[in-house]
Amino acid sequence: MAESDRLLGGYDPNAGYSAHAGAQPQRIPVPSLLRALLSEHLDAGYAAVAAERERAAAPRCWQARAVSWMWQALAATLVAAVFAAAVAQARSVAPGVRAAQQLLVASVRSTQAAATTLAQRRSTLSAKVDDVRRIVLADDAEGQRLLARLDVLSLAAASAPVVGPGLTVTVTDPGASPNLSDVSKQRVSGSQQIILDRDLQLVVNSLWESGAEAISIDGVRIGPNVTIRQAGGAILVDNNPTSSPYTILAVGPPHAMQDVFDRSAGLYRLRLLETSYGVGVSVNVGDGLALPAGATRDVKFAKQIGP
């Protein structure tokens, strides 16, 4: 024992340790402040207060959830009731709607039948008037000259039927292919139709320029007041719907007409559509083409000739 140890009362703090263990300093674990900040976010007091708050709020939370579930159930019940009422009303109204539709369809068909009957009667009376007029005017030379002039005017006005040689132009619309990805393949957006009203208008004008004396499209005579226009997916000729294939009859000198029509803008347009879209085009010479008279028009102006 060293002298200094005896002066301290004879106590040796390294007694019982080896020289190496006795010389090793004693380590006292000190908690790391950084580790405490990362692992212990709240003080024990704060944690206790938070836990107490959660225990106090638990009953209120269950009450709020119960109220929310109750409102949701009430809303679902109201929605189901509204849908049930709508279905019941639709079922009760459906028979009446169908009956009204059937009545409207029957009325439209009846009106169409009456209009067709009146149109036929009007055409019959017009033919009788024409026959009587010819009988009366055929007695003298002045009347015959007047009849000849009336025949020329009737041909120009498309008010008399015509039979004679001419050209038959048939145009077939193939419709756009359903698997085309190029938008330019559709001439009208959202429509499968290739032949349009302006194409038929150009063909008719080209036939007039070629020397045609009378023209008809699908049995409808082309006259001064006749229009060719587009109405959705249909082409109306004098308000009569037509469909492919479009048959255009032109009465006149067939060979001279064909020579001019082959170089016309109308046939050029059809050939271009034939190449680009596969439109069917045929031009044939025929004899004995029969064109009906045009629809009878209302007389708006008249002038008396003679006493």
From Swiss-Prot:
The keyword Membrane applies. The chain crosses the membrane at residues 67-87, 152-172. It is a multi-pass membrane protein. It is found in: Cell membrane. InterPro entries: DUF881 (IPR010273). Keywords: Cell membrane, Membrane, Signal, Transmembrane, Transmembrane helix. Its main location: membrane. The keyword Transmembrane helix applies. One of its GO terms (cellular component) is plasma membrane. Residues 1-23 form the signal peptide. Belongs to the UPF0749 family. This is UPF0749 protein Mb1854. It comes from Mycobacterium bovis (strain ATCC BAA-935 / AF2122/97). The lineage of its organism: Bacteria, Bacillati, Actinomycetota, Actinomycetes, Mycobacteriales.
